[in-house]
C-alpha cells in the first residue's frame, strides 16, 4: 500500500527501522530488503543508529542489482540534546549549519545524492514550537527546495505542535 505525501509524491505505508541494530545493521537491512521492504528509516544519531552501516548495506544491495531509485530512504536530523555527546555536526554552529552538516554527513554515510525524506527527529521545544524549532525547519525547507530531499517531516511531536507546524510552515 502506498500513500501520497503533501507534494503528491508517493510515500510508503511502512518502513524498516534501523535503530538499535548496532553492528548487525548492514546484514539486517539487506535481509529486510530481501524480505520485501522497499523503505528504510535511519538517522544521523550515533547513540541509536549506525547510518554508515545502512550505507554499506545499500552498496551491497547495489552489487546485487537493486537500484537506488527502487528504495525509499528516510533519515533524520537530531538536535544536540538527543545526540548523547556524539553529534555529527559542529554543536557550536548555528542550527541551520548543524542541519546542513548533519544532512551532508547522511548523504556520505548512505552513499547517495538525495534522500526521499528528511525528518526532524523531535522538536527542541517541549511545548509548542520555539525559535530554535523554526530555525531548524527553515533549514530543512531549504534542503527540500534544493531537491536534495523529496519531502520533509517531523516525528515525536504532540498534536498541538503538529497543528502549529502545518499552519505556519512554508
PLM segments and residue spans:
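N-terminal binding-site loop/beta-alpha segment at the start of enzyme catalytic domains
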Residues: 1-71, 75, 113, 139, ...
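Short acidic/His/Gly/Ser-rich catalytic and metal-binding motifs that mark active-site loops
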Residues: 81-85
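Short loop/turn segments at strand-loop or loop-helix junctions that form parts
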Residues: 75-78, 120-121
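Short, glycine/acidic-enriched loop or turn micro-motifs at the edges of active sites
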Residues: 44, 79, 124
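Glycine/proline-rich, positively charged
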Residues: 20, 87-170
